[in-house]
Amino acid sequence: MVSSFTSAPRSGFYYFAQGWKLVSQPGIRRFVILPLLVNILLMGGAFWWLFTQLDVWIPTLMSYVPDWLQWLSYLLWPLAVISVLLVFGYFFSTIANWIAAPFNGLLAEQLEARLTGATPPDTGIFGIMKDVPRIMKREWQKFAWYLPRAIVLLILYLIPGIGQTVTPVLWFLFSAWMLAIQYCDYPFDNHKVPFKEMRTALRTRKITNMQFGALTSLFTMIPLLNLFIMPVAVCGATAMWVDCYRDKHAMWR
């Protein structure tokens, strides 16, 4: 089925909603199964453990609040919870994406072919295995870009006042952008677009990508829904690629 998508500007919210629709398309479901299983097993177990630890971690975080901000504790406590969920959710979604990266790339490739009517390269299981080193190198590039920026934000958490007020907002914005990079990269990488060029392309539609990443980040924090977010985000990002970037960057048509 050739997509009826057009190049007309769409919001990131639209593409996130499209991900939920596309993930259940006939012919696509079988490519969803493995990423879905990886996410359910890893994120399900991780968040179950997290919720058993929150009553220890949150008081520890709140102990960094200076005395002059104690009157804001009723506002800072939920910010502390959200901060933990953001950091924890992104950390484990990164691990899940590393494990499922070859299958996410295949899902993006098959969905793109269905949306456009294009013929993808003939890649079976041996093609996927051959591509694993390149895919893992790409995942490492993303992690190397993410890590120093995340460390700076984590250090800011330790600064009294700023760490409990401003940093959670900065972390949410950073997570939104990083998740846009994470999921939009699969269709870009399928066409061998360099990592730096991909980031430059995303910046041309920064608001759209921030909207998409923000919703993905929010759903990553929600129990049960976060179990399904990986394939949904891959599908939504692929729809965005088809609309916004494919004409300029596609290697196969």
From Swiss-Prot:
What GO MF terms are annotated? high-affinity sulfate:proton symporter activity
Which ranges does the record mark as transmembrane? 31-51, 75-95, 151-171, 222-242
Q: Name one GO biological process term.
A: sulfate assimilation
Alphabetically ordered keywords of this record = Amino-acid biosynthesis, Cell inner membrane, Cell membrane, Cysteine biosynthesis, Membrane, Sulfate transport, Transmembrane, Transmembrane helix, Transport
Please, which domain of life does this record's source organism belong to?
A: Bacteria
Localization per record = Cell inner membrane
PANTHER family assigned to the protein according to its UniProt record, in alphabetical order: SULFATE TRANSPORTER CYSZ (PTHR37468:SF1)
| Protein name per its UniProtKB record | Sulfate transporter CysZ
